[in-house]
């Protein structure tokens, strides 16, 4: 019996959250084509044969001086020190310099390189990418081409990860799929709906706060506030006659209902907090409940 922690790291948009959801066969991590969508650590607990693999999905590694992005980078780096093995994820089309930058963090535990989205490339491109990474073969423990569309890739990956986990009793009940607070998952679903409905610049200065969750036998009542940094963005979130926020609410509700397996009544409000994303103390309170 083995049980241990795997940190999923890599640049933004490498597909880390999609991999986590596909391994779990359940959506708990926010997925977006926009960079740096993941803001909080999300974990997934996967039973593989008699072993328990606990994945930690972290914000993407990237260069940025913005306070919100720097806090997320710090969170990702901390997770590297708190795990048994690292899964470094790169898209087939990502530049290898991202891996070189990862190595500069001097990880102290074994790591596996996962080349994601290989279904988007031909064999020649894949072989070329593998050759680039093989220059660093003395650093990584394994390199695995991967596609979430190929079910057999899941077993290959889990078999490899388990090799580096310690012999240990289960950390969590085998029936659990995550220990991440439901509040964090739900607000990420709302944030994901915002990403899907608004232009590129708005989501990065927007945050979601869950104000109330009331669970009855057949229904969830959820009140949430969307925090905006400017009046103009607040207006765009609301939309003409409230059309945009209604659409955001509907899409978020469907996501939450699918995970919660019950009806959800979701009420969204919009609140102006100017430059909230530039205040580190405020960021820690909003993003990490500190």
Swiss-Prot record:
Residues where GTP binds: 10-17, 57-61, 116-119
Residue ranges, annotated region (G5): 146-148
Classification via SUPFAM superfamilies: P-loop containing nucleoside triphosphate hydrolases, Prokaryotic type KH domain (KH-domain type II)
Residue span(s) of domain KH type-2: 194-274
Region (G2): 36-40
Ribonucleoprotein in keyword set: no
Key word GTP-binding present: yes
UniProt entry keywords in alphabetical sequence: Cell inner membrane, Cell membrane, Cytoplasm, GTP-binding, Membrane, Nucleotide-binding, Ribosome biogenesis, RNA-binding, rRNA-binding
Membrane topology: Peripheral membrane protein
Region (G1): 10-17
Similarity comment: Belongs to the TRAFAC class TrmE-Era-EngA-EngB-Septin-like GTPase superfamily. Era GTPase family.
Quaternary structure annotation from Swiss-Prot or TrEMBL: Monomer.
Protein name: GTPase Era
Organism (species): Campylobacter lari (strain RM2100 / D67 / ATCC BAA-1060)
Gene it is expressed from: era
């Amino acid at each position: 019996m083995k049980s241990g922690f795997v940190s999923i790291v890599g640049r933004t948009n490498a597909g880390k959250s999609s991999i986590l959801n596909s391994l779990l066969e359940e959506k708990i991590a926010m997925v977006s084509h926009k960079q740096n969508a993941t803001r909080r650590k999300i974990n997934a607990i996967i039973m593989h044969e008699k072993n328990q693999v606990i994945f930690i999905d972290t914000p993407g590694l990237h260069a940025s001086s913005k306070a919100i992005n720097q806090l997320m980078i710090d969170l990702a780096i901390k997770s590297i020190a708190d795990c048994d093995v690292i899964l470094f994820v790169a898209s087939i089309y990502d530049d290898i310099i991202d891996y070189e930058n990862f190595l500069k963090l001097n990880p102290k535990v074994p790591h596996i390189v996962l080349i994601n989205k290989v279904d988007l490339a031909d064999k020649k491109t894949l072989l070329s990418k593998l050759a680039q990474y093989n220059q660093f073969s003395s650093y990584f423990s394994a390199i695995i081409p991967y596609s979430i569309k190929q079910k057999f890739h899941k077993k290959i990956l889990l078999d490899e990860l388990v090799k580096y986990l310690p012999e240990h009793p289960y950390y969590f009940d085998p029936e659990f799929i995550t220990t991440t607070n439901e509040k964090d998952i739900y607000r990420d679903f709302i944030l994901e709906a915002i990403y899907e409905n608004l232009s590129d610049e708005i989501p990065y200065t927007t945050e979601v706060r869950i104000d109330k969750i009331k669970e009855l036998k057949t229904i969830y009542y959820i009140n949430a506030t969307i925090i905006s940094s400017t009046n103009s963005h607040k207006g765009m979130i609301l939309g003409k006659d409230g059309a945009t926020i209604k659409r955001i609410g509907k899409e978020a509700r469907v996501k939450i209902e699918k995970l919660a397996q019950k009806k959800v009544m979701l009420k969204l409000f919009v609140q102006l907090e100017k430059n909230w994303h530039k205040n580190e103390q405020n960021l820690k309170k909003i993003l990490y409940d500190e």
